[in-house]
Amino acid sequence: MGRVLQKKKNRSSTPKQRPKRTGQLKSGKKKINVLGNAIIAQNWDRKLTLTQNYRRLGLVHKLNAPTGGSEKKPTKDGRIEELPEDPLHIRSSAKASAKQAAMGETRVERDPETGKIIRVIRDEEEIEIAGRKVKPSNPLNDPLNELSEDEAARQPASQRTNAKSAVVQQLERQADQEGKAVKAKKPRHQSKREEEWIMRLIERHGENYSAMARDRKLNPMQQSEGDLKRRIRKWKANHSS
């Protein structure tokens, strides 16, 4: 004879074993398939961590700036090398963005109707060096400085993308091809049953679309008058020849 407690457990409706959580880690976070893309899976190194793989491939796994845990390599002098700030990182605190903005007066452009600020116009103020006023971006007052900036802006995109890794270029080409495929989506063709249904509506009501919309026998799904017009217009275009 079994024990009373064991018999109660057997009669209980609670499951004996908890169901496995599919697609979740032990911490409760959702498991992300980083190898979902064929190009990334082909160039992925399983011996490296996610951050190391993304850095090697030229990708970014987080847009936010790192809050800690990043390794800073010492230089030959023994000092800690300060990594340059990535302009793509999103500042998470309002204090950091307030420090970045310079205090002072500036011009703004407002909406004439609502009065809201559309954009801030920041003029590059001149600074005085050795008794001469020059721009901060051109302290030597070089006349060829503006020409070099214009040449850099006119530089073709193929030359500017040389710094990108081969994986990033492949991903960009793949995204471009997918975008073109979405734009070139084929139109929906009417089925034979839909064409027969439209013919029955026309035989009974002719051009009276409002009567078609109210017909509960031939239009049981209560398609609207405008929807019926579009379907019949498409049907006539296909059978006009």
Swiss-Prot record:
Entry keyword annotation includes rRNA processing: yes
Source organism per UniProt: Aspergillus fumigatus (strain ATCC MYA-4609 / CBS 101355 / FGSC A1100 / Af293)
Main location: nucleus
Localisation: Nucleus, Nucleolus
PANTHER family: HSPC111 PROTEIN-RELATED, NUCLEOLAR PROTEIN 16
Stated family: Belongs to the NOP16 family.
Compositional bias annotation for Low complexity: 93-102
Keyword rRNA processing: yes
Start and end residues of each stretch annotated as Disordered: 1-30, 64-86, 92-111, 130-193, 211-241
Quaternary organization: Component of the pre-66S ribosomal particle.
Function: Involved in the biogenesis of the 60S ribosomal subunit.
Compositionally skewed regions (Basic residues) per UniProt: 182-191, 230-241
Origin: domain of life: Eukaryota
Biased composition (Basic and acidic residues): 70-86
Biased composition (Polar residues): 156-172
GO cellular component terms given for this protein: nucleolus; preribosome, large subunit precursor
Encoding gene (name): nop16
Protein name: Nucleolar protein 16
